A protein has these predicted regions:
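Ligand-binding grooves and catalytic loops that recognize ribose/phosphate and carbohydrate rings
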Residues: 221, 234-242, 248, 257-266
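Glycine-rich phosphate-binding active-site loops on the catalytic face of alpha/beta enzymes
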Residues: 142-144, 188-207, 244-254, 291-312
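Catalytic cores of alpha/beta
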Residues: 181-193, 227-239, 269-298
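An N-cap/entry alpha-helix motif that binds or orients negatively charged groups
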Residues: 2-120
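N-terminal active-site wall of soluble small-molecule enzyme domains
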Residues: 81-223, 229-234, 260-263
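C-terminal helical cap(s) of enzyme catalytic domains, especially alpha/beta-barrels
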Residues: 257-266, 289, 302-347
Length: 347
């Protein structure tokens, strides 16, 4: 049998590591300033969101990406650039582009802008969202961390509006991707019309349970981004039902190919799982599918792809191979089998 995640330990003294530390400090400052502004504005939309809970959490994201045909779903991630710190960690340093400083509250001063590698100008981000939806993605994600990705909460609202569809035929669910440290960020995502919100475990482990509860109370699905066995174990311990298991180590910015697949092995089948982080080929996605993932989140490879529909069709057109997981469940992972190694290289 596959080994379950190790029991979650006490995380009350846990602090964000590496690159995540300054990001968390920045997010806390932003939300602290915003909270001060809203203290005397009880009728502000964000205060009203937090005061009046949603009657239910529809669960549209989970239904959209847990396909019943044995094929992988694709979540298309929209962002204007990739963080400079990630490129630096991977030996990439050219093609820099600077974002404007800003945060959740229009007109508020923000920290100095960072630079990053331009992926797409996204001059009409709503149109780009419709383009991804037409290409066959099952859901969309919009990064709302403007300082690192060049997209913000207004871009999220624009995409939600552009792909809304009708009550009879709703468009794809839209996920707000952010480093969440405060309920106000979740309220902002809900106010913009998001279906779900990502919560980076490495940035908010001691507060993870309360943030997930806030998402549920506001009618959003909470997707926990986890990059270690501890983060996976703790997320499951506090009730997470959707995990984004990424190959990117946010504390260093480095890629760790296969890390998400390794983390997936002990996750129960009833948990919705999303893979991603530096995927470039259909083979990367197929390996995730064979490992049992429900979906893959793709950003740069979609935004810069000249054969978008064909690529999405290639990723989603192959049924998952369950034989690998069967043998893993029997205690054999095939790592010492030359034939298995050759098959892995062909991917």
């Amino acid at each position: 049998m596959a080994n379950p995640p190790a029991p979650a330990r006490n995380v009350s003294r846990w602090t964000p590591e590496g690159l995540l530390g300054p990001i968390v400090d920045e997010k806390r400052l932003e939300t602290e300033l915003l909270e001060g502004d809203l203290a005397h504005r009880p009728d502000h939309p964000l205060n009203l969101r937090l005061a009046f809970y949603a009657p239910s959490t529809p669960g549209r994201l989970g239904r959209a990406i847990r396909r019943g045909d044995g094929r992988l779903a694709v979540i298309g991630a929209l962002k204007r650039f990739t963080p400079a710190a990630y490129d630096d960690a991977r030996g990439l340093s050219d093609g820099r582009w600077s974002s404007a400083a800003g945060n959740m509250d229009d007109g508020r001063r923000g920290p100095p802008p960072q630079t990053g590698r331009l992926l797409s100008s996204l001059d009409d981000i709503g149109r780009d969202g419709r383009r991804l939806a037409a290409a066959g993605v099952s859901a969309l994600a919009v990064h709302v961390d403007e300082r690192r990705y060049g997209t913000d909460i207004s871009d999220l609202a624009a995409v939600v509006k552009a792909v809304a569809g009708t009550s009879a035929e709703p468009g794809p669910p839209v996920v707000a991707a952010d480093v969440v440290v405060h309920p106000l960020q979740i309220a902002a995502a809900a106010e913009a019309g998001a279906t779900a919100v990502t919560i980076v475990a490495g940035a908010a482990l001691p507060d993870l349970e309360s943030l997930l509860n806030t998402a549920t109370l506001l009618g959003l699905e909470g997707v926990v981004e986890a990059a270690s066995d501890l983060e996976v174990a703790y997320a499951l311990d506090v009730g997470a039902t959707a995990l984004y298991l990424t190959d990117v180590d946010r504390s260093t910015g480095r890629l760790r190919p296969g890390a998400g697949v390794a983390l997936r092995r002990g996750v129960p089948e009833w948990v919705t799982t999303i893979a991603g982080g530096g995927f470039t080929t259909a083979g990367d996605a197929w390996a995730a599918a064979d490992a049992g993932f429900d979906a893959v989140m793709l950003g740069e490879v979609l935004l810069r792809n000249r054969r978008l529909e064909g690529y999405v069709a290639e990723v989603t057109g192959r049924e998952r191979d369950v034989s690998r997981r069967f043998f893993e469940a029997m205690g054999y992972d095939g790592r010492d089998d030359p034939a298995a190694k050759a098959g892995a290289r062909r991917l």
